[in-house]
Amino acid sequence: MTNHQKRLSVPKSWPVERKTETFTAKAGAGPHGESGVPLVVVLRDVLEYVDDTSEAQYAINTDGVLVNGDSVGDVNRPIGMFDILAFPDRDEYYRVFPDEGGRLGLTEIDADAAGSKLNKVTDKTTVSGGRTQLNFHDGSNLALDEDAYAGGDSVVVDTDTNEIVAHFQYEEGALVTAVAGQHAGDIGEIAEINVQPGSASNTVRVDDENGGFETIAEYVVVIDENFVEEDDE
């Protein structure tokens, strides 16, 4: 199996130029599915901290870069929405956030903010012992004793303790950002949630400073004011 794929075939979310070199790295197994960007692409093409895969491998072998507070074993580890990248030697920290057009970008944050990660609850299941398991947008999950969360909610998880430190409900009036579709990167408040019959996708109407927009409910993630303030810095 090849470790490269043609640049013209990569997902639109990848922050790479499609008309330069023919091939780019292929994301390995891991979170975020097909939308995940290989870590080496972020280090080489976005941040320009390394020149090649060998330098990227050295960086992860020496814990020069951490993802969500953890060491990384594979330069092709997929990086995706809301992941936290930390560069301890540089004292630099970034959150992965979609820009206008849906491509993944990096927002610089401080060390305190880098200690936790925002997760969208896609659904929940009951596991052994009657515990509730929250399933998140990146494929990760968290088992809890309490059942206080719903699909569409967002939770902030401490990367050291794996405990939920904040909870934002998916409801009218909630602050959201669109992470896909033509409004990706836009931020506003949910004005209306429209539940569609059958298999049709639910939609939301969002009010923002540009007059608002309507999009598929799956495309929005609930955030809070602190999140916006950090991204504006």
Curated annotation (Swiss-Prot):
Belongs to the eukaryotic ribosomal protein eS4 family. Coiled coil: none annotated. The keyword Plastid does not apply. GO terms for cellular component: cytosolic small ribosomal subunit. This is Small ribosomal subunit protein eS4. One of its GO terms (biological process) is translation. GO terms for molecular function: RNA binding; rRNA binding; structural constituent of ribosome. Keywords: Ribonucleoprotein, Ribosomal protein, RNA-binding, rRNA-binding. Residues 37-99 form the S4 RNA-binding domain.
